[in-house]
């Protein structure tokens, strides 16, 4: 029998997306919850996270199936990760579990086939137009305001916490925008 557990994962082979800073925040602000970060043992981020006190679990090793099944909340930055995507669309995730999709960035393209075909109880978004685009009537999305939470992204909050402590510049590289990418070439 598992204690109240939240399972976090950016990607099976890397950290540094939205799940990592949310884990850092939640382990301080939700101390009664057991926090587990999922990442492969062979990943270069493993040692860095271990030194920072993360409770780590290799998704290819023993104990992962039990941790997934026992987690109250599963918090993911990438719902398409090959090691977990099938679990979201099958009996691999219980109806009593909550699946939170942190996303990687603002949804700008029509992703309804991917979103609608995946078990998502909460989708985190960053902007009002994004939230409206995901929840409005007469769109292809089946999401509602109940599932889509406009909270911003944890890694952006982490950047804000660095103000005045480290570098004071941020370089924006909109590589997701083909028009801007072509203009920069």
For every predicted segment, state its role.
Residues 6-8, 165-184:
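Conserved donor-binding/catalytic core segment of Leloir-type glycosyltransferases
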